[in-house]
Amino acid sequence: MIPVRCLSCGKPVSAYFNEYQRRVADGEDPKDVLDDLGLKRYCCRRMLISHVETW
C-alpha cells in the first residue's frame, strides 16, 4: 500500500510515488528524482525513500 500523505506535514505524496519508483528502477539517483519532483521537505522525501512494498 503506497503512502497517501506525509505522516509529519500531511502533504499528499501518492501522486509522486509511481514516477519516483519508475525513475529509480531505471537507475536514476533518488536525490535527483526527488528534486525534480519538487519534494523539498525531508519528511516528505523519507515517505518515498523508506517505503517497502509488502504485498
From Swiss-Prot:
One Pfam entry name: RNA_pol_N
* UniProt-annotated location(s): Cytoplasm
tRNA processing keyword on record: no
Q: Which residues form the signal peptide?
A: none
Molecular function, one GO term = DNA-directed RNA polymerase activity
PROSITE patterns per the UniProt record, alphabetical: RNA_POL_N_8KD
Keywords recorded for this protein, A-Z = Cytoplasm, DNA-directed RNA polymerase, Metal-binding, Nucleotidyltransferase, Transcription, Transferase, Zinc
Tell me how the cofactor is bound: Binds 1 zinc ion.
EC supergroup of this enzyme: transferase
> Subunit structure, briefly?
Part of the RNA polymerase complex.
| Role description | DNA-dependent RNA polymerase (RNAP) catalyzes the transcription of DNA into RNA using the four ribonucleoside triphosphates as substrates.
What family classification does the UniProt entry report for this protein?
Belongs to the archaeal Rpo10/eukaryotic RPB10 RNA polymerase subunit family.
Q: What is this protein called?
A: DNA-directed RNA polymerase subunit Rpo10
Q: Which gene encodes it?
A: rpo10
